Amino acid sequence: MATAKKELSADTQVTVLHQDAEHTVYRLDGTDGEVVQTVYPVFPGIEIAYHDVHATACAMQRTRASGCLEIHHCREGRIAYPYGGACFFLAPGDLAIVQRSAAAAPAHFPTGHYHGITVSIDPARAPDCLSCFLEDVEVRPSALIEKFCADAACFVTRSSQGVAHIFSELYSVPEGIRKGYFKVKILELLLFLSAFPMQAAQPQHSYPQSQVQLAEQVGAYLLENTERR
């Protein structure tokens, strides 16, 4: 049963469907379909969100807070995410890293559905260094932001063996070990990213928004006029 609502934008409201000590389930209303996010806090300022989307467009952020580091992984479907005047695309297995903007535009889902994960790190609330959780994990959120998001850049890479290993296990975590397992996997992910080669970025996954909008308009026109010759 829905327990609370708050406005995300003029067109989107966030409804809390379920909440307990370990996770919160949100429904994002105001879309042309169904969008559900299941969010688990892992460490102070660090959370993991599972997205189950059956819609063509939706605002993915539940708050207007800016500055957070977001690590997006696509498991199924497609996502087109506007960012910095451009738009990046993720297909199954792809990974993107961005720094959240308070004025982010809604994401689009060309196939009408999307399933994936976002790991969010709020540098204002997260520890300066994650070695406080596990010795020798010398990873600083500020250093990851500088590495992947310098000059408002968006880092996108195709699936690799390392990325697939980390995220495939996050989609099938037994409930009984979920809380501790998330902590281990998030530390593994961030340590992995701290050593990730920047040359693995895929700049061709990003396109100007004007080009994306034109392609969407052409696609919509063709769908509306399929019987015309």
PLM region spans:
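N-terminal regulatory/effector-sensing and dimerization cores
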Residues: 26-141
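N-terminal positioning helix adjacent to the helix-turn-helix/winged-helix DNA-binding module
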Residues: 162, 207-218
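Short, well-structured alpha-helical interface segments that form or flank functional binding sites
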Residues: 46, 66-69, 177, 181-184, ...
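Amphipathic alpha-helical segments enriched in hydrophobic/aromatic residues interleaved with Lys/Arg
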Residues: 136-185
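A short, N-terminal "cap"/entry segment at the start of jelly-roll beta-barrel domains
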Residues: 1-41
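Short, well-ordered coil↔helix boundary/capping segments
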Residues: 157, 209-212, 229
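Conserved strand-loop elements at the edges of beta-sheets that form or border functional pockets
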Residues: 42, 184, 225
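Basic, amphipathic alpha-helical hairpins
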Residues: 167-181, 190-203, 217-229
